[in-house]
Design a protein with these regions (language model features):
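Allosteric cytosolic regulatory segments
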Residues: 148-155
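Glycine-biased flexible loop/turn sites that connect beta-strands or occur in inter-domain linkers
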Residues: 48, 123-124
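A short, aliphatic-rich beta-strand micro-motif
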Residues: 111-122
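Helix-loop-beta substructure at the N-terminus of cytosolic sensory domains
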Residues: 23-56, 71-72
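Amphipathic alpha-helical coiled-coil "transmission" helices that mediate dimerization
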Residues: 162-201
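Regulatory sensory and allosteric helical modules in signal-transduction proteins
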Residues: 14-15, 45, 51, 55-61, ...
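Signal-transmission linkers at sensory-effector interfaces
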Residues: 1-28, 173, 187, 194-197
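Short beta-strand-to-loop transition segments that serve as allosteric relay/switch motifs
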Residues: 128-137
């Protein structure tokens, strides 16, 4: 079953784009967080998944070769519908939302999923830090809390990234303004020089 769109989909996608993280190269900061999530939850697979308009893209992953999947089969597309809660699916073959999902019915045969939403300060769900297994199971309360804490760490790093991007943009604008001022100054000096030449000639 394909997940419905969040009520704030337009603002959510705009917020995701503002972080400028889609299709970027792997970074050890995020790779470390999925390794920790996998270890704490005891799952073979952990992902940082960002839900774009028609796909989910993985900023970091362990236990999975793919870098993205179609949004219509994404468990995380369901998780972002309620950004304040972890979506837990103990056995996907017994959940009407996922039983016919090709990632469940076919390869890789997902059975268990838990996704902690990545939530902006404004409340938009960008994606999840999620863990998956290929046998039915569940997480202990302390594992769920740890998954949420790690998801907050992901968002803190994304926020820092966004602030750095904003600072760099501001610096580029300042540099552009300085170049324009320098060009204007040179133009004034040239005009002044030409005026002096004409005055001297006259």
């Amino acid at each position: 079953m394909q997940a419905p769109l969040p009520h704030n989909e337009g603002a959510r996608v705009a917020a995701l784009q503002a972080y400028r993280v889609l299709d970027t190269l792997p970074e050890s900061t995020y790779d470390d967080l999925v390794q920790i999530a996998s270890a704490i939850c005891g799952t073979p697979t952990a992902l940082i998944s960002l839900v774009d308009t028609d796909r989910q893209w993985f900023k970091a992953r362990v236990g999975l070769d793919s870098t993205e999947t179609s949004r219509d089969v994404a468990f995380c597309a369901h998780a972002i519908l309620n950004p304040s809660e972890v979506l837990t699916v103990p056995d996907a073959t017994k959940d009407a939302r996922f039983v016919e999902n090709p990632l469940v019915a076919g390869d890789p045969g997902i059975r268990f999923y838990a996704g902690a939403p990545l939530v902006t300060p404004e409340g938009e769900g960008l994606g999840t830090l999620c863990v998956m297994d290929y046998v039915p199971r569940n997480l202990e309360p302390h594992q769920l809390l740890s998954l949420q804490a790690l998801a907050r760490q992901v968002m803190q790093h994304l926020e820092m990234r966004r602030e750095i991007e904003r600072t760099e943009d501001a610096l580029m604008n300042v540099e552009g303004s300085l170049l324009e001022m320098e060009a204007y100054q040179r133009s004034l000096e040239q005009s002044h020089h030409e005026l002096e030449v004409r005055t001297t000639t006259d």
